[in-house]
């Protein structure tokens, strides 16, 4: 059997049983997958390859270019205590959804795409009529960074469109090669000697940026 188009996340898998996931359990689960260490109260970190296209690196760019620059210099991805629960909850839902949809003959989970020094892993790919259609699963609210990331994958796969799968709805996103300009801006920031302007306000990571600079 072949899949024509994906359905919303919570119409396919159980989302309710993870609502009571606590911080300690989430942190222990995350530590099973990679080395996580505590930098400051409420702040954790792990090693990260900044060549990889991910919602986190694009989110960081949109949230604060300086934070992205600092993380690159440290070689670390910074996590707030609050975000750890969201990460693990999202990861478990990802796995459940991917496991069910990968049973279709024309669906491939965790599809790696690589062009030059640009590396990405698409959650799901639907093979249809010689075209590879990317599907990204998102457990948070709809964000522009999600759309940008998917458009980058669409361009890399030379597809016409892709799908953003959220908890209760699915969005169709069409190809826009201008999204690749975001990667150019990110590369410029990562290669810069001086930090870009900050947008600190009440950012929890402010002490780390301040200490590095």
Swiss-Prot record:
<feature type="binding site">
    <location>
        <position position="209"/>
    </location>
    <ligand>
        <name>[2Fe-2S] cluster</name>
    </ligand>
</feature>
<keyword id="KW-0051">Antiviral defense</keyword>
<dbReference type="InterPro" id="IPR051827">
    <property type="entry name" value="Cas4_exonuclease"/>
</dbReference>
<keyword id="KW-0411">Iron-sulfur</keyword>
<dbReference type="InterPro" id="IPR011604">
    <property type="entry name" value="PDDEXK-like_dom_sf"/>
</dbReference>
<feature type="binding site">
    <location>
        <position position="137"/>
    </location>
    <ligand>
        <name>Mg(2+)</name>
    </ligand>
</feature>
<keyword id="KW-0408">Iron</keyword>
<keyword id="KW-0269">Exonuclease</keyword>
<feature type="binding site">
    <location>
        <position position="203"/>
    </location>
    <ligand>
        <name>[2Fe-2S] cluster</name>
    </ligand>
</feature>
<keyword id="KW-0464">Manganese</keyword>
<feature type="binding site">
    <location>
        <position position="123"/>
    </location>
    <ligand>
        <name>Mg(2+)</name>
    </ligand>
</feature>
<dbReference type="GO" id="GO:0045145">
    <property type="term" value="F:single-stranded DNA 5'-3' DNA exonuclease activity"/>
</dbReference>
<keyword id="KW-0479">Metal-binding</keyword>
<dbReference type="GO" id="GO:0051537">
    <property type="term" value="F:2 iron, 2 sulfur cluster binding"/>
</dbReference>
<feature type="binding site">
    <location>
        <position position="94"/>
    </location>
    <ligand>
        <name>Mg(2+)</name>
    </ligand>
</feature>
<keyword id="KW-0001">2Fe-2S</keyword>
<comment type="subunit">
    <text>Monomer.</text>
</comment>
<dbReference type="GO" id="GO:0000014">
    <property type="term" value="F:single-stranded DNA endodeoxyribonuclease activity"/>
</dbReference>
<feature type="binding site">
    <location>
        <position position="136"/>
    </location>
    <ligand>
        <name>Mg(2+)</name>
    </ligand>
</feature>
<keyword id="KW-0378">Hydrolase</keyword>
<dbReference type="InterPro" id="IPR013343">
    <property type="entry name" value="CRISPR-assoc_prot_Cas4"/>
</dbReference>
<feature type="binding site">
    <location>
        <position position="200"/>
    </location>
    <ligand>
        <name>[2Fe-2S] cluster</name>
    </ligand>
</feature>
<dbReference type="InterPro" id="IPR022765">
    <property type="entry name" value="Dna2/Cas4_DUF83"/>
</dbReference>
<feature type="binding site">
    <location>
        <position position="64"/>
    </location>
    <ligand>
        <name>[2Fe-2S] cluster</name>
    </ligand>
</feature>
<comment type="function">
    <text>CRISPR (clustered regularly interspaced short palindromic repeat) is an adaptive immune system that provides protection against mobile genetic elements (viruses, transposable elements and conjugative plasmids). CRISPR clusters contain sequences complementary to antecedent mobile elements and target invading nucleic acids. CRISPR clusters are transcribed and processed into CRISPR RNA (crRNA). A ssDNA exonuclease that has 5' to 3' activity, yielding 5'-OH and 3'-phosphate groups. Has Mn(2+)-dependent endonuclease activity on circular ssDNA. Can unwind dsDNA; unwinding does not require ATP.</text>
</comment>
<dbReference type="GO" id="GO:0046872">
    <property type="term" value="F:metal ion binding"/>
</dbReference>
<dbReference type="GO" id="GO:0051607">
    <property type="term" value="P:defense response to virus"/>
</dbReference>
<dbReference type="Pfam" id="PF01930">
    <property type="entry name" value="Cas_Cas4"/>
</dbReference>
<comment type="similarity">
    <text>Belongs to the CRISPR-associated exonuclease Cas4 family.</text>
</comment>
<protein>
    <recommendedName>
        <fullName>CRISPR-associated exonuclease Cas4</fullName>
        <ecNumber>3.1.12.1</ecNumber>
    </recommendedName>
</protein>
<keyword id="KW-0540">Nuclease</keyword>
